[in-house]
Curated annotation (Swiss-Prot):
InterPro entries: Bacteriocin_AS48 (IPR009086), Circ_bacteriocin (IPR020038). It comes from Bacillus safensis. Cyclopeptide antibiotic that inhibits both Gram-positive and Gram-negative bacteria. Shows potent to weak activities against M.flavus (MIC=3 ug/ml), B.cereus (MIC=12 ug/ml), B.pumilus (MIC=12 ug/ml), E.coli (MIC=12 ug/ml), and S.pneumoniae (MIC=47 ug/ml). May act by forming pores. One of its GO terms (biological process) is killing of cells of another organism. GO terms for cellular component: extracellular region. This is Pumilarin. The lineage of its organism: Bacteria, Bacillati, Bacillota, Bacilli, Bacillales. Gene3D superfamilies: Bacteriocin AS-48 (1.20.225.10). It is found in: Secreted. Coiled coil: none annotated. There is a cross-link at residues 39-108 (Cyclopeptide (Leu-Trp)). Its main location: secreted. The cross-link permits a high resistance to proteolysis. Is more resistant to specific proteases than to unspecific proteases. Pfam families: Bacteriocin_IId (PF09221). Residues 1-38 form a propeptide.
Length: 108
């Protein structure tokens, strides 16, 4: 089996996925460890407002992660469909050239 430059090795993909999940877990853990009281004292805001701000930041991070995953899957899927379509058209034209001849296919 020949490899092309565009192939992604499965172990590299799973390694990157594992690193991503580890970073997400560490980020979530660090947000939980931030003391709300210190945040409130530093900026002079009530503790309830500080808790809401932290929850919004954490939710924003989750939304960003989900959008990034969907974008990656979508762009990879579209390029795969485009490549399959290109190969299908190429094969169809080769078959038509064999049946009708090159000049007939060009005139068609």
């Amino acid at each position: 089996m020949t490899e092309t430059k565009n192939e992604i090795k499965l172990h590299v993909l799973f390694g990157a996925l594992a690193v991503g999940f580890l970073m997400l877990a560490l980020f979530s853990f660090s947000l939980q460890m931030l003391p709300v009281a210190d945040l409130a004292k530093e900026f002079g805001i009530p503790g309830s407002v500080a808790a809401v701000v932290l929850n919004v930041v954490e939710a924003g991070g989750a939304v960003t992660t989900i959008v990034s995953i969907l974008t990656a899957v979508g762009s990879g899927g579209l390029s795969l469909i485009a490549a399959a379509g290109k190969e299908t058209i190429r094969q169809y034209l080769k078959n038509e050239i064999k049946k009708k001849g090159r000049k007939a296919v060009i005139a068609w």
